[in-house]
Amino acid sequence: MRDRVRRIYRNVSDGLDLIVFLNSTEPHIDRSFFYATGLTDGLFEGCGAWLTPDGGCEITTSALEEEAAKKSALPLHVFRSRDDSTKLMKAALRGHKRIGINASELTYAAFERLRKLASKSARFIDISEAVVTTRLVKDAAEIERIQRACDIASRSFEEVLPFIPSGVTEAEVASELVYRMQKNGATGPSFHTIVGSGPNGAEPHYTAGSRKIEPGDMIVIDFGAAYHMYCSDITRTVVVGKASEEQRRMHETVARAQAAAFAKMKPGSTAKSVDAAARSLIDRSKYKGRFIHGLGHSIGLAVHDGGALNSTSDLVLRPNMVFTDEPGVYVPGFGGVRIEDDVLITKGEPRFMSTAPRDLREL
């Protein structure tokens, strides 16, 4: 993990002598703790990763997580009480004057604790942007885990399709999909599965309710697998029965928009130019203004892992970044279509990591 730590330091402009990733209680767990330590399981509430400029990393861990922490092969400092934790943190901070913190993931209470334990002359510097910049470019191990998460989710989607036309509820479809993903090797879902049938498909972040799926429904299914903390994020839209002309037109429009964006996902392209490729196509159709969110986001240890593909981002794409490509069209009262895939930026052509069928399936 030394290379990851060194990369973070290289992306920080300030001359820091220490970086701290400090967890609070669930859900306030900093995924960068796992990035720096290489750990892929455990909760690690109240635990910290202490990074030094030479690439070193040590962990302060509760006794509860000691066995999990040993898998990192990093130096451990184990606490069994809050007093123990305070002593270890004070020792780790001693002598350090310029300390980097991931302020976007650090609670105010945790920051105040750090501030009180550090020397009065210590200065804390927010390195959130540098952390995002570092995590945007994945290493080989990360790409392998994301690919595994994509493979699991893609396979599970195909397995669940025969289950859908049987008059089940949205929640039952979501449960079946999560079951299939875990049966196929996922360590869990990467987020709450979205199953929006009929008019519910017009809500991009609808979850999955008690509505029973009916013949003629168009269904937006947004799902992802977690594989040792790394995420996939895929969306497919299907129809129960034969698709209407309008349903087919919506799907074809979104499919063309996704393909236009995919063709632009190469090193040197800006995020906003990729977004524009999809958005301009939709806005030239009858669905102008119905694409109501950004085109995509980075994925990795988090489903939304930092960078975004949207109309205002100047982010420049680089090899080994992984983004979603997910245009959508939403018509209140009628429904929606979204097609989402996970895309690896390479030195040449982009590559779809997710392989679930993208065509409009009539179930």
Feature roles, as predicted:
Residues 1-363:
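Active-site neighborhoods and metal-handling regions in enzymes and metal-associated proteins
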